[in-house]
UniProtKB/Swiss-Prot annotation:
Expressed by the venom gland. This is Delta-buthitoxin-Hj2a. This non-amidated recombinant toxin slows fast inactivation on Nav1.1/SCN1A (EC(50)=52.8 nM), Nav1.4/SN4A (EC(50)=32 nM), Nav1.5/SCN5A (EC(50)=116.7 nM), Nav1.6/SCN8A (EC(50)=46.3 nM), and Nav1.7/SCN9A (EC(50)=147.4 nM) voltage-gated sodium channels. On Nav1.1/SCN1A channel, acts as an agonist by inducing a shift in both the voltage dependence of channel inactivation (alpha-toxin activity) and activation (beta-toxin activity). It holds the Pfam family Toxin_3. PROSITE patterns: LCN_CSAB (PS51863). Disulfide bonds join 12-63, 16-36, 22-46, 26-48. Its main location: secreted. The keyword Chloroplast does not apply. SUPFAM superfamilies: Scorpion toxin-like. SMART domains: Knot1. GO terms for molecular function: sodium channel inhibitor activity; toxin activity. Has the structural arrangement of an alpha-helix connected to antiparallel beta-sheets by disulfide bonds (CS-alpha/beta).
Length: 64
């Protein structure tokens, strides 16, 4: 797995305000844990720890 911003099918981060929301989204996708990264590269987005390789992550390029 990898530590990364989890993304949806449009390469957009999961916008967040609370750590609990991100921890839930990350763990239900197989990650160890997750939290809300405030004012990061992509704004307020969910960061997951040890996310499985099959789950899409935010990559360079536009959020569609």
């Amino acid at each position: 797995g990898r530590d990364a911003y989890i993304a949806d099918d449009k390469n957009c981060v999961y916008t967040c305000a609370k750590n609990s929301y991100c921890n839930n989204e990350c763990t239900k996708n197989g990650a160890e844990s997750g939290y809300c990264q405030w004012l990061g590269k992509y704004g307020n987005g969910c960061w997951c720890k040890n996310l499985p390789d099959k789950v899409p992550i935010r990559i360079p390029g536009p959020c569609r």
